[in-house]
């Protein structure tokens, strides 16, 4: 057996249809495009968002909302996370939180929230604190510093 002897399995190779090559071919004259109309023309494609000339849905619906570009987006950390990760008396900074993988990025700052309980006195330095987080940290003898 040689490489030149290899043939495809009978019926596995379909012959390409050549359109517009005479009426006898079965795909002559209109070449399978029917008569007239947009889809019979060259590049005659109707896009999926086209609604037949009526005002499209995205123009019928009202505009609403906006993006507040002055809004501060804080990376959020709860006091229960500080309890698990940091030792008693340790200083907690945004850089240490980033380093230990508590937050993925600092964004516009770090905000400490009061979800969970804390028993270790920590010095927490952050950009913002919720009132419950501030109260819980100071209740166990910790310090709160706003950057």
Curated annotation (Swiss-Prot):
Region of interest (Disordered), residue spans: 1-54
SS bond list: none
The keyword Ribonucleoprotein belongs to this UniProt entry's keyword annotation: yes
Record keywords: Ribonucleoprotein, Ribosomal protein, RNA-binding, rRNA-binding
Purpose: Binds to the 23S rRNA.
Family, similarity comment: Belongs to the universal ribosomal protein uL15 family.
The protein's name in its UniProt record: Large ribosomal subunit protein uL15
Lineage: Bacteria, Thermotogati, Thermotogota, Thermotogae, Thermotogales
């Amino acid at each position: 057996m040689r490489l030149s002897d290899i043939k495809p399995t009978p019926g596995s190779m379909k012959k390409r249809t050549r359109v517009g090559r005479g009426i006898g071919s079965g795909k002559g004259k209109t070449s399978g495009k029917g008569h007239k109309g947009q889809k019979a023309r060259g590049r005659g494609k109707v896009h999926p968002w086209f609604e037949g000339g009526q005002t499209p849905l995205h123009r019928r619906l009202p505009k609403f909302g906006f993006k507040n570009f002055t809004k501060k987006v804080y990376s959020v950390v709860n006091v229960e996370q500080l309890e698990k990760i940091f030792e008693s008396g340790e200083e907690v900074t945004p850089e240490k939180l980033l380093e230990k993988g508590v937050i993925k990025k600092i964004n516009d700052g770090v905000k400490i929230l009061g979800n969970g309980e804390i028993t270790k006195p920590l010095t927490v330095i952050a950009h913002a604190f919720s009132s419950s987080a501030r109260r819980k940290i100071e209740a166990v003898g910790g310090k709160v510093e706003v950057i």
